[in-house]
Amino acid sequence: MSYNLTDPYEIARYIKEAKKSTPIKAYIEGDLSNCDFTNIEKFNSGDLYILFGESEEILVIIENNKDKIKNCRIEQDRRKSAIPLLDMLKVNARIEPGAIIRDKVLIGENAVIMMGAVINIGAEIGEGTMVDMNAVVGARGKLGKNVHLGAGAVVAGVLEPPSSDPCTIEDNVLIGANAVILEGIKIGKGSVVAAGSIVTTDVPENVVVAGAPAKIIKEVDVKTKDKTKLLDDLRK
Protein backbone atom coordinates (compact mmCIF):
# COMPACT_ATOMS: atom_id res chain seq x y z
CA MET A 1 0.00 0.00 0.00
CA SER A 2 1.32 3.44 -0.94
CA TYR A 3 1.00 6.66 1.02
CA ASN A 4 1.35 10.31 0.07
CA LEU A 5 3.70 11.47 2.80
CA THR A 6 3.29 15.12 1.79
CA ASP A 7 -0.25 15.03 3.24
CA PRO A 8 -0.61 15.11 7.05
CA TYR A 9 -3.70 12.90 6.93
CA GLU A 10 -1.83 10.35 4.80
CA ILE A 11 1.07 10.38 7.27
CA ALA A 12 -1.42 9.76 10.08
CA ARG A 13 -2.96 6.88 8.09
CA TYR A 14 0.50 5.44 7.47
CA ILE A 15 1.19 5.49 11.22
CA LYS A 16 -2.24 4.03 12.02
CA GLU A 17 -1.90 1.15 9.56
CA ALA A 18 1.76 0.37 10.20
CA LYS A 19 2.48 -2.85 12.05
CA LYS A 20 3.38 -1.85 15.59
CA SER A 21 6.64 -3.26 16.87
CA THR A 22 8.05 -3.90 20.34
CA PRO A 23 11.51 -5.31 19.66
CA ILE A 24 13.62 -6.50 22.56
CA LYS A 25 17.06 -7.96 23.16
CA ALA A 26 17.34 -10.84 25.65
CA TYR A 27 20.51 -12.18 27.26
CA ILE A 28 19.85 -15.68 28.54
CA GLU A 29 21.90 -18.28 30.38
CA GLY A 30 20.24 -21.68 30.18
CA ASP A 31 19.38 -24.69 28.04
CA LEU A 32 17.30 -23.52 25.07
CA SER A 33 18.51 -26.21 22.69
CA ASN A 34 15.00 -27.50 21.94
CA CYS A 35 13.40 -24.11 21.29
CA ASP A 36 11.93 -22.89 18.02
CA PHE A 37 13.68 -19.66 17.07
CA THR A 38 11.67 -18.94 13.92
CA ASN A 39 11.45 -15.15 13.42
CA ILE A 40 14.05 -14.60 16.17
CA GLU A 41 17.67 -13.68 15.53
CA LYS A 42 19.80 -15.92 17.74
CA PHE A 43 23.45 -15.86 18.77
CA ASN A 44 24.69 -18.47 21.20
CA SER A 45 27.68 -20.29 22.57
CA GLY A 46 26.80 -23.26 24.73
CA ASP A 47 24.16 -22.16 27.22
CA LEU A 48 24.66 -18.43 26.60
CA TYR A 49 22.13 -16.85 24.22
CA ILE A 50 21.49 -13.40 22.80
CA LEU A 51 18.07 -13.09 21.16
CA PHE A 52 16.71 -10.25 19.03
CA GLY A 53 13.03 -10.17 18.09
CA GLU A 54 9.49 -9.15 18.95
CA SER A 55 8.69 -9.17 22.64
CA GLU A 56 5.74 -11.57 22.48
CA GLU A 57 7.82 -14.26 20.74
CA ILE A 58 10.86 -14.03 23.00
CA LEU A 59 8.79 -13.80 26.18
CA VAL A 60 6.97 -17.01 25.23
CA ILE A 61 10.32 -18.82 24.98
CA ILE A 62 11.37 -17.44 28.37
CA GLU A 63 8.08 -18.41 30.03
CA ASN A 64 8.02 -21.91 28.53
CA ASN A 65 11.61 -22.61 29.57
CA LYS A 66 11.85 -20.78 32.89
CA ASP A 67 12.86 -23.96 34.71
CA LYS A 68 15.87 -24.29 32.37
CA ILE A 69 16.98 -20.66 32.59
CA LYS A 70 19.54 -19.59 35.20
CA ASN A 71 19.79 -15.90 34.36
CA CYS A 72 17.95 -13.55 32.02
CA ARG A 73 18.18 -9.86 31.21
CA ILE A 74 15.96 -7.96 28.76
CA GLU A 75 16.66 -4.63 27.05
CA GLN A 76 13.85 -2.59 25.50
CA ASP A 77 13.83 0.92 24.02
CA ARG A 78 10.33 1.25 22.51
CA ARG A 79 6.81 -0.15 22.71
CA LYS A 80 4.27 -0.51 19.89
CA SER A 81 6.44 1.66 17.69
CA ALA A 82 4.90 2.50 14.31
CA ILE A 83 7.86 3.97 12.42
CA PRO A 84 11.39 2.54 12.44
CA LEU A 85 14.44 4.72 12.89
CA LEU A 86 16.52 5.92 9.97
CA ASP A 87 19.31 3.65 8.73
CA MET A 88 22.15 6.05 9.49
CA LEU A 89 24.76 3.90 7.75
CA LYS A 90 23.40 5.22 4.44
CA VAL A 91 23.84 8.89 5.41
CA ASN A 92 27.00 10.92 4.71
CA ALA A 93 26.62 13.26 7.68
CA ARG A 94 27.83 13.57 11.28
CA ILE A 95 25.21 12.18 13.63
CA GLU A 96 26.08 12.19 17.33
CA PRO A 97 24.87 9.65 19.93
CA GLY A 98 21.39 10.21 21.30
CA ALA A 99 19.91 11.80 18.18
CA ILE A 100 16.52 10.31 17.28
CA ILE A 101 15.79 10.30 13.55
CA ARG A 102 12.75 8.49 12.17
CA ASP A 103 12.63 6.72 8.84
CA LYS A 104 11.83 8.60 5.60
CA VAL A 105 13.97 11.59 6.60
CA LEU A 106 16.39 13.09 4.06
CA ILE A 107 19.75 14.32 5.36
CA GLY A 108 22.15 16.17 3.05
CA GLU A 109 25.90 15.82 2.68
CA ASN A 110 27.99 16.99 5.65
CA ALA A 111 25.01 17.91 7.79
CA VAL A 112 25.50 17.72 11.57
CA ILE A 113 22.89 16.27 13.93
CA MET A 114 23.84 16.79 17.56
CA MET A 115 23.04 14.87 20.75
CA GLY A 116 19.38 14.77 21.69
CA ALA A 117 18.08 16.21 18.42
CA VAL A 118 14.75 14.79 17.24
CA ILE A 119 13.80 14.66 13.56
CA ASN A 120 10.38 13.36 12.59
CA ILE A 121 9.10 11.53 9.53
CA GLY A 122 9.33 13.30 6.18
CA ALA A 123 11.69 16.05 7.34
CA GLU A 124 14.47 17.29 5.08
CA ILE A 125 17.84 18.51 6.38
CA GLY A 126 19.96 20.34 3.80
CA GLU A 127 23.63 20.03 2.97
CA GLY A 128 25.91 21.49 5.64
CA THR A 129 23.04 22.21 8.04
CA MET A 130 23.44 21.75 11.80
CA VAL A 131 20.59 20.63 14.05
CA ASP A 132 21.96 21.44 17.49
CA MET A 133 21.44 19.70 20.83
CA ASN A 134 17.80 18.95 21.79
CA ALA A 135 16.41 20.78 18.76
CA VAL A 136 13.25 19.37 17.15
CA VAL A 137 12.32 19.21 13.48
CA GLY A 138 8.69 18.15 13.19
CA ALA A 139 7.11 16.03 10.47
CA ARG A 140 7.93 17.33 6.97
CA GLY A 141 9.93 20.28 8.31
CA LYS A 142 12.30 21.50 5.61
CA LEU A 143 15.71 22.98 6.42
CA GLY A 144 17.78 24.30 3.51
CA LYS A 145 21.55 24.34 3.07
CA ASN A 146 23.92 25.73 5.72
CA VAL A 147 21.17 26.38 8.26
CA HIS A 148 21.94 26.46 11.98
CA LEU A 149 19.02 25.32 14.15
CA GLY A 150 20.04 26.28 17.68
CA ALA A 151 19.90 24.14 20.79
CA GLY A 152 16.36 23.49 21.98
CA ALA A 153 14.77 25.22 18.99
CA VAL A 154 11.58 23.81 17.45
CA VAL A 155 10.51 23.70 13.83
CA ALA A 156 6.86 22.63 14.07
CA GLY A 157 5.54 19.66 12.12
CA VAL A 158 2.39 19.15 10.06
CA LEU A 159 0.76 16.32 11.99
CA GLU A 160 -0.97 17.73 15.06
CA PRO A 161 -2.64 20.06 14.46
CA PRO A 162 -2.73 18.94 10.80
CA SER A 163 -1.30 21.44 8.32
CA SER A 164 -0.91 21.09 4.56
CA ASP A 165 2.09 23.44 4.46
CA PRO A 166 5.31 22.39 6.18
CA CYS A 167 7.70 24.79 7.87
CA THR A 168 10.33 25.86 5.37
CA ILE A 169 13.68 27.24 6.51
CA GLU A 170 15.60 28.48 3.47
CA ASP A 171 19.38 28.44 2.93
CA ASN A 172 21.82 30.20 5.27
CA VAL A 173 19.30 30.89 8.04
CA LEU A 174 20.38 30.97 11.69
CA ILE A 175 17.78 30.15 14.33
CA GLY A 176 18.81 30.87 17.90
CA ALA A 177 18.46 28.59 20.89
CA ASN A 178 14.93 27.79 22.10
CA ALA A 179 13.23 29.66 19.27
CA VAL A 180 9.93 28.22 18.01
CA ILE A 181 8.84 28.29 14.38
CA LEU A 182 5.10 27.61 14.21
CA GLU A 183 3.28 25.42 11.67
CA GLY A 184 3.55 26.39 8.02
CA ILE A 185 5.93 29.32 8.53
CA LYS A 186 8.60 30.17 5.96
CA ILE A 187 11.92 31.79 6.91
CA GLY A 188 13.61 33.51 3.96
CA LYS A 189 17.23 33.04 2.90
CA GLY A 190 19.94 34.55 5.06
CA SER A 191 17.66 35.65 7.89
CA VAL A 192 18.35 35.39 11.62
CA VAL A 193 15.84 34.40 14.30
CA ALA A 194 16.93 35.55 17.76
CA ALA A 195 17.10 33.10 20.64
CA GLY A 196 13.78 32.50 22.39
CA SER A 197 11.69 34.03 19.62
CA ILE A 198 8.28 32.67 18.64
CA VAL A 199 7.76 33.08 14.91
CA THR A 200 4.08 33.26 13.95
CA THR A 201 4.31 34.85 10.47
CA ASP A 202 6.55 34.38 7.44
CA VAL A 203 9.95 36.07 7.58
CA PRO A 204 11.44 37.69 4.44
CA GLU A 205 15.03 37.25 3.31
CA ASN A 206 18.03 38.85 5.04
CA VAL A 207 16.35 40.27 8.13
CA VAL A 208 16.72 39.77 11.87
CA VAL A 209 13.59 38.95 13.87
CA ALA A 210 13.18 38.77 17.64
CA GLY A 211 10.49 38.58 20.29
CA ALA A 212 7.27 36.75 21.02
CA PRO A 213 5.69 37.11 18.59
CA ALA A 214 8.80 37.74 16.51
CA LYS A 215 9.07 41.06 14.67
CA ILE A 216 11.65 42.43 12.25
CA ILE A 217 14.18 44.53 14.16
CA LYS A 218 16.69 45.21 11.38
CA GLU A 219 18.19 43.98 8.15
CA VAL A 220 21.14 41.61 8.21
CA ASP A 221 24.33 43.69 8.02
CA VAL A 222 28.06 43.01 8.09
CA LYS A 223 28.12 42.94 11.89
CA THR A 224 25.25 40.45 12.00
CA LYS A 225 26.93 38.19 9.45
CA ASP A 226 30.14 38.23 11.48
CA LYS A 227 28.30 37.31 14.70
CA THR A 228 26.33 34.50 13.06
CA LYS A 229 28.88 32.94 10.71
CA LEU A 230 29.14 29.16 10.61
CA LEU A 231 32.31 27.13 11.11
CA ASP A 232 33.09 24.86 8.19
CA ASP A 233 35.39 22.72 10.35
CA LEU A 234 32.35 21.49 12.30
CA ARG A 235 30.94 20.03 9.11
CA LYS A 236 33.96 17.98 8.06
UniProtKB/Swiss-Prot annotation:
It comes from the Bacteria. GO terms for molecular function: tetrahydrodipicolinate N-acetyltransferase activity. The keyword Iron does not apply. It holds the Pfam family Hexapep_2. PROSITE patterns: HEXAPEP_TRANSFERASES (PS00101). CDD domains: LbH_THP_succinylT. Pathway: Amino-acid biosynthesis; L-lysine biosynthesis via DAP pathway; LL-2,6-diaminopimelate from (S)-tetrahydrodipicolinate (acetylase route): step 1/3. Keywords: Acyltransferase, Amino-acid biosynthesis, Diaminopimelate biosynthesis, Lysine biosynthesis, Repeat, Transferase. GO terms for biological process: diaminopimelate biosynthetic process; lysine biosynthetic process via diaminopimelate. InterPro entries: DapH (IPR019873), DapH_N (IPR013710), Hexapep (IPR001451), Hexapep_transf_CS (IPR018357), Trans_hexapeptide_repeat (IPR050179), Trimer_LpxA-like_sf (IPR011004). Its EC number is 2.3.1.89. NCBIfam families: DapD_Ac. PANTHER family: 2,3,4,5-TETRAHYDROPYRIDINE-2,6-DICARBOXYLATE N-ACETYLTRANSFERASE, ACETYLTRANSFERASE. Belongs to the transferase hexapeptide repeat family. DapH subfamily. Catalyzes the transfer of an acetyl group from acetyl-CoA to tetrahydrodipicolinate. This is 2,3,4,5-tetrahydropyridine-2,6-dicarboxylate N-acetyltransferase.
